[in-house]
Amino acid sequence: MAAAFSHVIFDLDGTILNTLEDLAAAGNHTCEAHGWPTFAVDEYRYKVGNGMLKLVERFMPAEYAGDGRMFEQTLAEFRAYYGEHKEDHTGPYAGTIEMLDRLRAAGVQLAVLTNKDHVSAAPLIEKYFGSERFALVQGRVDAFPPKPEAPVTLHVMEELGADPATTLYVGDSNVDILTGHNAGLKSAGVSWGFRGRAELEAAGADYVVDTQEELAALILGE
């Protein structure tokens, strides 16, 4: 039986890789360097998801809102630290590699589309998933507005030769659900990520799954 979806585009952070601890460590290191308040790791679940610029904006004290010079300095410091430490605690969610291999064996084409800077996203995918599992990896670049705006998703689909009717976007946050819908795709939310089932359902997810096995069955039409 043919798979229900011929192409699947995955978010990265909170969907296939658990990057939260390293993102939080980089944010708190940057805050500590300035004598600013730091945050619990779990608080970063709601600071990530819209790219590094938004993440930095969210952990900077409110008194620096609108201070472009301080923002650029803080962003550079965060990027430098994260670039050196992005693999300290990061790893794939249990069952993810097996799920991806099952999908590929069934002929499903896989891609990654993330708001993480491309210079960080591409090496992480290479390290943890190799170069063969994903046909395309697209991180944040200046040429496109970030998710959930449609242009970057449409670009990925064009590169893949994907049909919207048989393409699924998979992620762990409201941003991801909107990313799929804004490009005319169905969106599946994964409850094991940073945000959880309630946010995904409120965002209008077409599907919400709790395990990698459940996601594979959905994609394969089982």
Enumerate the predicted regions with their spans.
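Hydrophobic, well-ordered secondary-structure segments
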Residues: D13, T30, E77-D88, A111, ...
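N-terminal helical cap/lid subdomain that shapes the substrate entry/recognition surface
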Residues: A2-E98, R104-A106, V119, S131
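Asp-based, Mg2+/Mn2+-dependent phosphohydrolase catalytic module
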Residues: M1-H7, R104, H118, A122-E222
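Conserved SAM-binding loop
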Residues: I16, P92, L110-L113, Y169-V170, ...
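Small/polar loops that bind or transfer phosphate-bearing groups
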Residues: D11, T19, V48, V112-L113, ...
